[in-house]
A protein has these predicted regions:
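Membrane-proximal coiled-coil signaling linkers
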Residues: 15-25
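Generic hydrophobic, aliphatic-rich segments that mediate packing or membrane embedding
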Residues: 21, 39-42
């Protein structure tokens, strides 16, 4: 009889210890899940910011395009002016070169930003999947906690 009582006490002690540990694991899983959701929110903010920067780059590209057209028009007018328009033609050519450099830089920047946007979107997708898995783990742990609590 003493042996049965001893075994029962040991089982109760182990169940209590298991209950305590499973509660701790559950809290850590909830904490991890919350941190995952915070990360997803931050990544969404980065994504929004990248889209806004893309809009600014588009405006810069449009300005470069318009400047290039103005430079071409100025070159035509300089040619019409003949010898008197040579100095103006040089300035128009420099403006054209500057517009082309601006357009190239805007395009390169837009490509880099789009690459970042794509990577952030992929990261958000992975983080969402991870968060869903963590949520399932938390739910499963809560079920285990209930079972162990009823035993302890």
């Amino acid at each position: 009889m003493n042996e049965i009582a001893k075994e029962t006490n040991e089982n109760a002690t182990q169940a209590t210890t298991g209950n305590k540990l499973i509660h701790e694991v559950g809290e850590e899983a909830k904490n991890g899940n919350e941190q995952m959701h915070n990360m997803i929110e931050a990544m969404n903010d980065i994504n929004t910011s990248s889209h806004n920067i893309s809009k600014v780059i588009k405006v810069i590209d449009d300005i470069a395009f318009q400047t290039n057209i103005l430079a071409l028009n100025a070159t035509v007018e300089a040619a019409r002016a003949g010898a008197h328009g040579k100095g103006f033609a040089v300035v128009a050519e420099e403006v054209k070169n500057l517009a082309e450099k601006s357009a190239a830089a805007a395009n390169e920047t837009a490509e880099m930003i789009q690459s970042s946007i794509d990577k952030v979107e992929e990261g958000v997708k992975i983080a969402d999947e991870t968060a869903a898995s963590l949520t399932k783990i938390v739910e499963s742990l809560e079920n285990v906690v209930e079972i162990i609590s009823s035993i302890a």
